[in-house]
Amino acid sequence: MKEVDLGKSLDREMSLWRYMSIDKFIDLLSNQKLFLTPLAYYQSSDPFEGFVPKVAFEATMKIFIDRIEEAEAAGVEIEKLLRERVSSPTTEQLEAIEKMKAMSKAHRESLIPLNNKISKSTCVHCWYHSESESEAMWKLYSDSGKGIAIKTSVAALVDSLNVCNQDVPLRLGRVKYLDFLSNELTPKDCVIDGATSPLLKRKEYEHENEVRLYSVPQLMTAERWESYEPRPILVKVDVSSLIENIYISPYVGEPFTSSVRKICELLGVPNEKVINSKLLENYEKMLAGFVKV
């Protein structure tokens, strides 16, 4: 059984929010699965998704290029020794040498496309970190104001996944926001919770304050990656332990509010977990309730 690999930047008590439309909420309750989206699918909203700053990309490429050059140097040495010790190498020996050279060339040519393919195929499920509701998140992720927000914690999210028998590796980490074009960035700046691309975004998106659950397809070989097309991953989750509270959008009234409560009742969510957002509640009335005159 695979358990979630929890990033060190996260505290288990941190509050997390997931804002969504009612149809996605019903789908979650009905199917008991989280939808992880390939980074490739976010191209329209953020063309930099799946990419890293130049300094991080160069450092990553250097690691792989160094390995290729080590293999090439070993190949050159083998060929040199062979020609020194054997006056007339056999056809099979010469073919083996040429095959090594061709493999090295292919590895070099596929290095950047393969790196991009792996990054774009990484699947993520995003949560907003805050101890309170966010007016901006309501507007961004509800359907014309008709939406709900699930409130949970890092601990509840991890535990709700771990009780299910996961068949894909899952990691949870906090997104780091950087100026991708800054000349002062170092490779170390571009690592968070042991990862780069799935947990790096531009500073322009810092308002999202994201915590990401993510998974990288385990294909292993370059040949399999070449034919792979990014696709979503569905992971099982125990919704009853995931949900601490459900908040109903502050931009709606009846019959939406009672409809959400009925849906929750039918799908097994206790009524005491369902809360009407007080984000836009009349503050003058609230003050009157605070002070007795």
Predicted regions located by residue number:
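Partner-binding and oligomerization surfaces adjacent to conserved cores of proteins
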Residues: 1-293
